[in-house]
Design a protein with these regions (language model features):
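Ligand-binding beta-strand-loop-alpha-helix segment within the catalytic cores
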Residues: 62-136
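Generic domain-boundary/flexible-linker signal
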Residues: 53-54, 119
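N-terminal glycine-/serine-/threonine-rich phosphate-binding loop
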Residues: 1-48, 54-64, 73, 77
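An acidic- and aromatic-residue-enriched active-site/binding cleft used to recognize and process polar
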Residues: 48-49, 113
Length: 136
């Protein structure tokens, strides 16, 4: 068995919309399966900044237009983005494995992060989510 390889994919590397993400995960899956084919155990972690931002904007817009839908908390938007990024990666990897006649299990796992609301980092955020906008 080869080495365990951990791959970190930034959310920006996955595109700025769903069609771009589908292209990115297909290309990424080929490289990942190359590593698996070489005998490595592969673990993938991914970012979700642009994706969670798009979901947050969509959910906020829905809430403004239909008050029966409350604004989704960031934890829910994060889980939604992890789920759809994860399933797209999982499906692309599984398809690439299938094309190569390789029987390897692939799983998506959602994660949770606990933060201290009093953390000094909240005073000067450095990690944006969603679209960038110019100050007016």
């Amino acid at each position: 068995m080869g080495k365990r390889v951990v791959i970190a994919l930034g959310g920006n590397a996955l595109g700025n919309n769903l069609p771009e993400q589908m292209i990115a995960v297909k290309q990424t899956a080929r490289a990942i399966v190359d590593l698996i084919e070489e005998g490595h155990e592969v673990i993938i972690a991914h970012g979700n900044g642009p994706q969670v931002g798009m979901i947050n904007i969509a959910m906020t817009t829905l809430s403004r237009e239909d008050h029966s839908h409350p604004i989704a908390p960031m934890s829910v938007c994060t889980a939604m983005s992890q789920g759809y990024i994860g399933i797209d990666l999982q499906n692309a990897i599984k398809y690439e494995l299938y094309k190569r006649n390789m029987d390897v299990k692939v799983s998506t796992i959602l994660s949770q992060v606990e933060v201290d609301p009093e953390d000094e980092a909240f005073k000067n955020p450095t990690k944006p989510i969603g679209r960038k906008s110019e100050a007016k």
